[in-house]
């Protein structure tokens, strides 16, 4: 048993960050930008690469406005055309791939057509796998210039192995998301200790980590940064917007949009190996407003951390308060 697992387990609602002396007059002085790969983005936030969160139209808007994105892989036949379309618009292309045999043919097709995406994400529920490692090696051999993220994982050992195989970043989180029921269906995952898993993985990581899942409040973004995340992947909080995929549904005068997990019945089209669920999320208006609010709250986090940029958050102290911070507020 690795001694990392002797650490106390905790999650986002169990932690409060401790303020430092402020050095800015206004939070507007605080810089939230982050370099990821060869590009710098406005905030360390990326919408989940789920079919109910992102589509081509939203990907274009995000790239045009300085945000990172990862296109989902659930319409595989459209990916090459998507890369071509983004490049023709002068935008970066960021795609997802799996590990099935035909994905190797897809990589070969991209090389043959000279359609190399700037970012590629190997998107597998259990990313600590010999097949993921094989795919990492293949992609880095065929497309050495693509910035390659691999995941998802839960342990320091997994981070080490994927990095050693050639991954440029690793995605941490197995089943903590709102629409994911892996923890209930299988008994495995980081649900309830996602933040502790991130902390453990950051102890050994030599390359960037993406915290994926379990984000419920904007303050959780700052907590993710404190415990080692370079980027924070968010699903349910970035679903339900005007630009989001999914049908608009009205119930008792209230407006909702559909949101579903990537291994749900909706996604799979049949009841088989289901580890996700469908739900309704409140309609939230424009995603631009939500992303701006996330930026402003993160600026406030930086000011509380006593700094001017995200690095200051990584140095603050924290206390474990075990589910008392909500104090009936939510």
From Swiss-Prot:
Record-linked InterPro entries: Aldolase_TIM, GMP_reductase, GuaC_type_2, IMP_DH/GMP_Rdtase_CS, IMP_DH_GMPRt
Catalytic site: 180
Enzyme Commission no: 1.7.1.7
Reaction catalysis annotation: IMP + NH4(+) + NADP(+) = GMP + NADPH + 2 H(+)
Swiss-Prot/TrEMBL keywords: NADP, Oxidoreductase
GO biological process, one term: purine nucleotide metabolic process
GO CC annotation: cytosol; GMP reductase complex
An example Gene Ontology molecular-function term: GMP reductase activity
Signal peptide stretch: none
Binding annotation for NADP(+): 209-232
Family: Belongs to the IMPDH/GMPR family. GuaC type 2 subfamily.
Role summary: Catalyzes the irreversible NADPH-dependent deamination of GMP to IMP. It functions in the conversion of nucleobase, nucleoside and nucleotide derivatives of G to A nucleotides, and in maintaining the intracellular balance of A and G nucleotides.
NCBIfam families: GMP_reduct_2 (TIGR01306), PRK05458.1 (NF003966)
Full protein name: GMP reductase
Organism: Lactobacillus delbrueckii subsp. bulgaricus (strain ATCC 11842 / DSM 20081 / BCRC 10696 / JCM 1002 / NBRC 13953 / NCIMB 11778 / NCTC 12712 / WDCM 00102 / Lb 14)
